Amino acid sequence: MAFESLTERLQGVFKNLRGKRKLSEKDVQEVTKEIRLALLEADVALPVVKEFIKRVRKRAVGHEVIDTLDPSQQIIKIVNEELTAVLGSETAEIEKSSKIPTIIMMVGLQGAGKTTFAGKLANKLVKEENARPLMIAADIYRPAAIDQLKTLGQQINVPVFDMGTEHSAVEIVSQGLAQAKENRNDYVLIDTAGRLQIDEKLMTELRDIKALANPNEILLVVDSMIGQEAANVAREFNQQLEVTGVILTKIDGDTRGGAALSVRQITGKPIKFTGTGEKITDIETFHPDRMSSRILGMGDLLTLIEKASQDYDEQKSAELAEKMRENSFDFNDFIEQLDQVQNMGSMEDILKMIPGMANNPALANVKVDEGEIARKRAIVSSMTPEERENPDLLTPSRRRRIASGSGNTFVNVNKFIKDFNQAKKMMQGVMSGDMNKVMKQMGINPNNMPKNMDSSALEGMMGQGGMPDMSELSGTNMDVSQMFGGGLKGKVGEFAMKQSMKKMAKRMKKAKKRKK
């Protein structure tokens, strides 16, 4: 994920400040020097770095830091605020037309991800606004781009207008807009041609399309993996076309992230969306304050909550909770839950959105094996509908058939079913509030719990029967996390369990005091 090295460097800088009661001007100079080096290593453009450091230093050498009793927190606060300002301060929405359709023109270099982004944005508009977009394939130089856009359109059930490669891009856009008005589409997304580098022919064509379409938005799609060159590309396109916003693609890649910090400052135009993966749903509205928080390792709970809420169905959740309580959770429910977890993104990225988890050493032990998840899916897919609904039907002969059909060994199938049954029992205990049962399932003897810990009161920690934090179940005899292809292992898992027990003991003390 982008920014990982920058986050690590900045956290190291802030760590060195801890314990200091006050900072001298010399200390501030040293801190800002380290921040400057960290930004340059992250491929942030030099002019942006200079301006950023100048602003941080100006605030830090004043009364804001030198006279404060907690300089490390104050420095972090200043850096966070200035970083947010560099990224744009406020979230920028799509500029909509007062009359339909709203026309959005995608521009950028070849390979930046314009076509893919057009599909992602169209899907987002359909899902969130119940919109009726039309996509126009205006890249006449790459037949593959037209085919790709049509494939994406079929995937998300959005119409694509194309006239092949025999007509000019301007003619195609003209005909496409006429069709959009006739069909009363509320959005038109124009996928334009790109080049491996900026040239006058490309710009002339784009200017002609702009003059014809009069778009509400001209979104520059930038590949975040090209580093400092992103700033030059953004500057040139903005000078020629006056873009209205920027899209950063491939931000999930192993990049240094400097593009995000450079583009906004150099063009003066807001970053509106980021591409966070290969799936059609891997698109996020860009929030400067949240991105700043992520870069500084402070997490991003709001985005995490939004991701979790996208496919949330209150009725289904209530039904699932009841099935857990009644111990009738089946393999169909398991696959449904697996889909929901995977739709949120990789487990590593989800954990990094939790405050304090970015670059946490424990994350090095969290490994989600996609192959393992695929094997579990294959096992369930090889079951009959009756077997999925009633796991008790799985006799040894049926398990051998499932192993053969799914390409797994008999041992692996047995282990999967055993883990599933143990997880069911544990979930039933959690939902019913029987914590003694839960601890036994986890391999913990309730009699060995700390004396100041009343297990009957543990259900108060669960939010009145809610599910516990599954990360606190790691390092136990029953590794429920393995059901989803990964988890904390070894000494780290054991340490996490002990820390969890200590936290629960403290919370029990507080709960008892409140009752008194």
From Swiss-Prot:
Instruction: From the Swiss-Prot or TrEMBL record, state where the protein is found.
Output: Cytoplasm
Q: Which Gene3D superfamilies does its entry note?
A: P-loop containing nucleotide triphosphate hydrolases, Signal recognition particle SRP54, nucleotide-binding domain, Signal recognition particle, SRP54 subunit, M-domain
What does the UniProt keyword field contain? Cytoplasm, GTP-binding, Hydrolase, Nucleotide-binding, Ribonucleoprotein, RNA-binding, Signal recognition particle
Q: Is Ribonucleoprotein included in the keywords of this UniProt record?
A: yes
Gene Ontology biological process terms in this record: SRP-dependent cotranslational protein targeting to membrane
Reactions the enzyme catalyzes: GTP + H2O = GDP + phosphate + H(+)
One Gene Ontology cellular component annotation held by this UniProt entry: signal recognition particle
Per its record, what are the GO molecular function terms? 7S RNA binding; ATP hydrolysis activity; GTP binding; GTPase activity
The record's statement on gene disruption is: Doubling time increases for growth under nonstress conditions, unable to initiate growth at pH 5.0 and under 3.5% NaCl salt stress. Double deletions of Ffh and FtsY, Ffh and scRNA, or Ffh and YidC2 are barely able to grow in the absence of stress.
Stated EC number for the protein is 3.6.5.4
Pfam families attached to this UniProt entry: SRP54 (PF00448), SRP54_N (PF02881), SRP_SPB (PF02978)
Q: Does the keyword GTP-binding apply?
A: yes
- Record-annotated residues binding GTP? 108-115, 191-195, 249-252
Map out region (Disordered) in residue numbers.
383-405
Function (record text): Involved in targeting and insertion of nascent membrane proteins into the cytoplasmic membrane. Binds to the hydrophobic signal sequence of the ribosome-nascent chain (RNC) as it emerges from the ribosomes. The SRP-RNC complex is then targeted to the cytoplasmic membrane where it interacts with the SRP receptor FtsY.
Report the family membership. Belongs to the GTP-binding SRP family. SRP54 subfamily.
Q: How does it assemble?
A: Part of the signal recognition particle protein translocation system, which is composed of SRP and FtsY.
Notes on the domains? Composed of three domains: the N-terminal N domain, which is responsible for interactions with the ribosome, the central G domain, which binds GTP, and the C-terminal M domain, which binds the RNA and the signal sequence of the RNC.
NCBIfam families noted in UniProt: ffh
What is this protein identified as? Signal recognition particle protein
Recorded source organism is Streptococcus mutans serotype c (strain ATCC 700610 / UA159)
